[in-house]
Every structure is written in C-alpha cells, then in structure tokens.
From Swiss-Prot:
<keyword id="KW-0943">RNA-mediated gene silencing</keyword>
<dbReference type="GO" id="GO:0031442">
    <property type="term" value="P:positive regulation of mRNA 3'-end processing"/>
</dbReference>
<keyword id="KW-0813">Transport</keyword>
<dbReference type="GO" id="GO:0000245">
    <property type="term" value="P:spliceosomal complex assembly"/>
</dbReference>
<keyword id="KW-0866">Nonsense-mediated mRNA decay</keyword>
<keyword id="KW-0508">mRNA splicing</keyword>
<dbReference type="InterPro" id="IPR003890">
    <property type="entry name" value="MIF4G-like_typ-3"/>
</dbReference>
<feature type="short sequence motif" description="Nuclear localization signal">
    <location>
        <begin position="3"/>
        <end position="20"/>
    </location>
</feature>
<dbReference type="GO" id="GO:1990904">
    <property type="term" value="C:ribonucleoprotein complex"/>
</dbReference>
<dbReference type="GO" id="GO:0034518">
    <property type="term" value="C:RNA cap binding complex"/>
</dbReference>
<keyword id="KW-0507">mRNA processing</keyword>
<keyword id="KW-0963">Cytoplasm</keyword>
<dbReference type="GO" id="GO:0005739">
    <property type="term" value="C:mitochondrion"/>
</dbReference>
<dbReference type="GO" id="GO:0006401">
    <property type="term" value="P:RNA catabolic process"/>
</dbReference>
<keyword id="KW-0539">Nucleus</keyword>
<comment type="similarity">
    <text>Belongs to the NCBP1 family.</text>
</comment>
<keyword id="KW-0506">mRNA capping</keyword>
Amino acid sequence: MSRRRHSYENDGGQPHKRRKTSDANETEDHLESLICKVGEKSACSLESNLEGLAGVLEADLPNYKSKILRLLCTVARLLPEKLTIYTTLVGLLNARNYNFGGEFVEAMIRQLKESLKANNYNEAVYLVRFLSDLVNCHVIAAPSMVAMFENFVSVTQEEDVPQVRRDWYVYAFLSSLPWVGKELYEKKDAEMDRIFSSTESYLKRRQKTHVPMLQVWTADKPHPQEEYLDCLWAQIQKLKKDRWQERHILRPYLAFDSILCEALQHNLPPFTPPPHTEDSVYPMPRVIFRMFDYTDDPEGPVMPGSHSVERFVIEENLHCIIKSYWKERKTCAAQLVSYPGKNKIPLNYHIVEVIFAELFQLPAPPHIDVMYTTLLIELCKLQPGSLPQVLAQATEMLYMRLDTMSTTCVDRFINWFSHHLSNFQFRWSWEDWSDCLTQDLESPKPKFVREVLEKCMRLSYHQHILDIVPPTFSALCPANPTCIYKYGDESSNSLPGHSVALCLSVAFKSKATNDEIFSILKDVPNPNQVDDDDEGFRFNPLKIEVFVQTLLHLAAKSFSHSFSALAKFHEVFKTLAESDKGKLHVLRVMFEVWRNHPQMIAVLVDKMIRTQIVDCAAVANWIFSSELSRDFTRLFVWEILHSTIRKMNKHVLKIQKELEEAKEKLARQHKRRSDDDDRGSDRKDGALEEQIERLQEKVESAQSEQKNLFLVIFQRFIMILTEHLVRCETDGTSILTPWYKNCIERLQQIFLQHHQIIQQYMVTLENLLFTAELDPHILAVFQQFCALQA
C-alpha cells in the first residue's frame, strides 16, 4: 500500500488519470464496434438489435455524445449499403432524445457542406440520401426536405456553370426518391410535381455529346447503352407510375412506426448549394452498363427490368458494398454473397454485372483493375456450384459482342481474362471460339484471342501455352520470345558492321570499359556522312545498330542481365543517342532484336526512359513510325505509350511538389523570423529563393515537355487518320475498317486515360490541332472529350 501511495504521490496521480483515459477509450471503441457491426449476422432480429443499441447509446449520451455524433455521421458517409439501418437507429434516438436528433441533423448538414466544398460528391450523394430517409423515420419534416430538393433542382437554372454541376444536383435529388419519394408525394404533391417538371425540362435540353466516348459498346442491341441520368429518370418515372411501390429496400423503421410517429420532427436549416468556383471538380457523366436481362436466367428468380427502380437499388447497394470493402477481397466477396433479399433476385447475375460495370467504367474503374480479378476469383471459391457458370456465361457474351466493344474495354477484358485463366490452370473451352479462326487476323475476335494468349504466356511460359490450346489455334499463339540477332548466322558475314559486331562481342565478354567500346566503334563508317546537316555527322545508324544488337543479344538471358547491360554502358548509349534521330534508332534496333518478346520491349523502353537514354517524345515518334505499322494495333504498343505518358506526368508532379515544398519552407522561415536584424536568416532566404527560382524554371521546362509530348501524339494521330480517310475517299471504300476502329478509339483512350492533364492544354490543342478545318470524324473525338466536363 505504501509503495502504491508513494507512487501516486510521485506521479501526481497520473496512473489514476491513465486508467480513466483507458476506460474511456475502451468504452469509445466498444461503441464504435456496436455501431459498425449492427445489421450483421446475429442470433437476434435486426429490430431487437437496433432497439438494444438505441438504449445503450442513449445511456452513453451524457458522457460520449460528441463521439456518438461523429460515429453516426461517419457511417452515414462511409457505409451507405446500411443506410436504412442507421436512419432507423437515429430515429429511435431522436424519439428518446429530441435535442440529440437536432444536433445530429445539424452535424449532417455541416458534413454535407464540407463534402461539397472538398469536391467529395460521391460521399455527398450518400449524405443527401441519408437525410432524405430520415423523413421516413420522423426525424426530418417532409416540407423542409422538399425545400432542399427545390434548391437542388434550381441549380439547373444557373448560367455559365458546367453541365456536370447541374447534373450532380439533379442526380442527388432523383437518386434519393426510391427511399423517400412516396412520403414526399403524400405530404407535398404539388411542390414535388413542380420539381419534377423542372427536372424533366432540364433533362430534355441537356447536351449528350459525351455519350459515345463513354459507351462500352457502340451498338444498342441486345441492351441499350443509356446515359445515367436518362436511365435514372426512366426508373423514377416508372416508380411514380407504380404509385411509389418499391419492393426491395430494407425498411426496418416500419417495425417501429408506433414509436417513431410520436417523435417530434426537425426542420432542415435553409440549404443553398455552394456556388461554382474554379476549384470545383464534379463527377463525370456515366453510361449505364447492361449485360443481363430476365432471359439469361430462366430458372431462377426474375431479374428486374432495366427501367425498374429495384434494378437501380440493387446495383447501387452492390456498388456500395464494393466501395466499402474493396481493400479486403475476402470480406468484400462474403458481403456480396450475403446480400439481404438474395433469394428474391438472381444475385450472382447482379454481382457479375456490377463487377464488370465497374471494370469497364470509362474513363477509369473506381478501383485498381486487379482488384476485380481477385474479387471474382474469391467469389468463385465462395460459390463454386453457381458463380463460375454465370461468369463463363458473361465471358461468352463479352466475346460475342467484341465487334462493337470499346477498344479500352477490350484491353481490360484481355487483362482480366488472362489473369483469371492463370488462376484456373488456363482451362477454357477454346473450341467454342473456333469461329475466330476463319476471320481476318485484324478482326476483333482473333485479335482478342491472340492478345489473351500473349498475356497468358507472360503469366506462364511459351510451351505451356502451345500445350493448352488446340493445334488449330497455332496461328494465334504467340511467337517463341527469343532474341533475333542479325549478326548471329553465317549469312550475316556480308552485312555492314559484321566484323565490328564480332569485336564488340569479344570485348563485352572480356568486361570491356566504355572507353574501350568507344574505341572499337570509332571507325564504323557513317552512312549519313553525305548529309549536309550537322545531325548527319553525329547520328550514325550503323554504329547504333552494331552496338545495340550485340549488347542486347549477349544480355538476353533475363531482364536483370539486360538492365545491367544498359547500366554498364550507359555512357555509350547516351553518346550514340545524343540526337533525336539517334534516340529513335536505338528504339528501332531494340525492337528488331526483341520483336517476338513484347514484355521485354516494354521493360527495356521503360528502363531507357528512366535512365534518360531516350525521352518520352522519342518513344511517341517511334510508336507512330513505319517500322511499327505492322504492330500498331497490338496491345503492348499502347501499354508502352500510356506508361510513357504516365512517367512524364509523374515527373512534372514531382518537380511541382518540390517547388511547393520549397515555397512552404520559405514561408515558414519568414514566419519564424524575429523582429531583430537576422543576417543569417537573410542568407538562408537568399539560398531558398535561388532554389525556388531554379525549380520554377524546371517546372516550366517539364510542363513544356509534357505539352510537347501530347502535341506530338495528337499530331501523329491526326496525320495517320487523315491519310486513311483520304485514301478511303479516293478509292471509294468504307472508312470503317478494323484498323480505323482501333485507331480512332486509341485516340479516345489517350483523352480518357489522361483527361486531367490534357484539360490543362485544351486551348493549345484547339488552336493548333483540333481546328474547325479538321475532318469531322477526328474532330468529333475532341468535341466528345470537351463535353465530359462542360
């Protein structure tokens, strides 16, 4: 006892404080666990759990009110799939403690304003939906909710604002109606009719230039590719016609109607949508993905129609589950297959359709592509007797519709399918796809199979791929990924540079230095010597050919051998590739050596950019060069180009970040500076200001390179597409060839995948390249892109 008392005296009672803090933390953690887990599988009914939890929270309100408020606001934002469970809980708390209900509504409005200010529009939709469902729980008075929606729809009358801003407020209103439409119409039918009329008027006049760029398929058969607001409007119209009868939303508050209807309600404070600013970034429009209908599962429960509001609710809830649990594939899969009401719907079909809808979403999926692969694999493990069959059916449907599928989505389909096969011993009924063998190799189906097998080889090895596919598919199988060394056989003796290649080979094997290699290359004759331009003397194609061919041949054993070779003879590479022509020729020779190994080409280009042997513009020019024309539509070529663009973008962002950090550091120094004359601080400021000036120059230079890269890419696209269009017009043939479809959609892909960066250079692109004189087929792509954020 004395020791304990002595300890208290010395510590000023700190252990007691710590125990208090520890107890408080334990209680808070317990409350968080209870709130987050309500609605999960339990021996008791949901209603019983909600009533019990409301009692626990009410008892803890005196001590933990701010924590409970914060938790409930967070789950409203982050767990939208359990929306009605939490609105019921708030309703029960409001019935027991009116003041708490008022504070919660105020906190939600604050959170909504913060989300809109921070451009978190997806979360803001969930908050609006939550508030609207509180009307059903007698927490919020219906007239004040109608007033808020009136303010939302009034945004459609704003002038000089982007259409995507108006779209969001209309979507926030319409997407809440499956939950609260009936209640609002019963209380305020005239006002709701007026809002509906304004909404309809807006939807009729809004522009939809962007739609073709966002469609997964160019054809509307068998399922229309509807713009998201058009589809939702049709669903709400049908719901209204059906007298707001909706049969799928879980509504636990109905069990507590006698309690909730006695509660006092709160009026929402007047809500004015925050004005549009230059920093406002609204969600892009979407096209609704449809793959299945009721005919695809004739034996199971009937799938709701595409304009049924149940279809919207189911899909919305499944998207919410993926959004909440995507980082944990096992949990995510378990949550999806245990979806409430699963016995009333063909759940596996809905799950597969929703996953592919996200994977194929343009311009980009909500989550990293590989997540969808791992999630589908996990679902196949959880439901081995049913889900693999639905997935196979979906794969067959996608294959059958390849002719009209967006090239970007075909790329994702290739990557998903090859990765999926690698997890199931590459088993597939290839004979079912033998129709592709009679088609032109550039047609979508044989091209798809070829690219899938190429990707499968990356995940396996060449001989294994030959073994798993029928012999009839040999024309579509990838080539043996071996190095092609032009100086390697006897017939090469007469080739220019053959003797130098032999000398280089011996030197490389003897671990020669860069200077020794320069010495061997010194006397290689220059075919460009006759040129008058200065670059002709510096650019020696034969010297590059002999050096690159021989070095890559000797380093062909593995990726790491090739990387080591690039690193060891980096000085030679830099000297030979000093000019633009030199950089281009290094890439050409590398491609000749590894033309049968796309993966090696990709990693070597990546390494050459990182080590500054070649630059991004050189890679872009190489991709559009005549040497690559035979492989121009191959997937690996476009993976290289997109990787190159991403590297340039990262480079610019890195320097911009360094500049911002330097500016912040200078601002902190100014803030800390005392009133005294501190010459040391002046010196530090001077050094920092010089650093900022240098970084500013680097940023401007990098941005200039970035802009130039996009100008090169778009200029080359315009040139080759214009040549094709003129040739077709001259010959009197159709422009709609497989090559044209691939090329014009690759142009769309560049715009979509790098839209945030390209938007910075819109004025330059419009003034220099995408002018009114351009062919309408090409100009249409630019106009569709402009409409995405218009």
